[in-house]
Curated annotation (Swiss-Prot):
Sequence repeats lie at residues 60-91, 92-123. It comes from Plasmodium falciparum (isolate fid3 / India). May play a role in the merozoite attachment to the erythrocyte. A lipid is attached at residue 238 (GPI-anchor amidated asparagine). Residues 46-225 are annotated as: Disordered. InterPro entries: MSA2. The keyword Cell inner membrane does not apply. This is Merozoite surface protein 2. Residues 82-101 have a biased composition (Polar residues). Glycans are attached at residues 22, 36, 152, 168, 213, 237-238.
Amino acid sequence: MKVIKTLSIINFFIFVTFNIKNESKYSNTFINNAYNMSIRRSMANEGSNTNSVGANAPNADTIASGSQRSTNSASTSTTNNGESQTTTPTAADTIASGSQRSTNSASTSTTNNGESQTTTPTAADTPTTTESNSPSPPITTTESSKFWQCTNKTDGKGEESEKQNELNESTEEGPKAPQEPQTAENENPAAPENKGTGQHGHMHGSRNNHPQNTSDSQKECTDGNKENCGAATSLLNNSSNIASINKFVVLISATLVLSFAIFI
């Protein structure tokens, strides 16, 4: 009988320890699952809240500001005297940001006597004009002379004014010299205040840099994510309920073992 009682007691302790280990493992797995689920849902909500903005490539709009025009025409004229004249003008008009135009024309005249005349304009004959949006009037010789006279006058006045300014500065710098150490002395007492404020800001920043021991479930509840908070708490409640059930089973089994050991 004593052997049976001792064995039953040993079995009871083994059973209790085994159930406690299983309960701890089971509760830990449930807690870990709840924690992982809360993290996943928070990440999913953050991903849905962020708006994905696609980077639009800039459209390269190339606009040709110049237009090229080329005209070729040939004209032949014959008179009653048997004279024939052939003219072949070639005009190339190129218009760019500053529109330039160049015209080249060649004319050939042939008579019955076998004489041929060919006229080709030179570079001096081809006019080149430059057009701009802001036309500037030409400056004549009289206007240029007036301009130079005005500049000479202003230069003389500028030199005189510079000399006067130098004299005024030299006179003003004399009495201001002894005032510099006073300003330096006035600036020195302000230095420790800046140091104090810098230290205060550093201490304040170091306080804020300490990590706060708050769990993710509490953050989610405070942030207003009620769904995640409810899911995490529900899973934790389920794990606590399962743990209480396991404890109840352990107590029942313990009472049965003790009653069997006592009454046998």
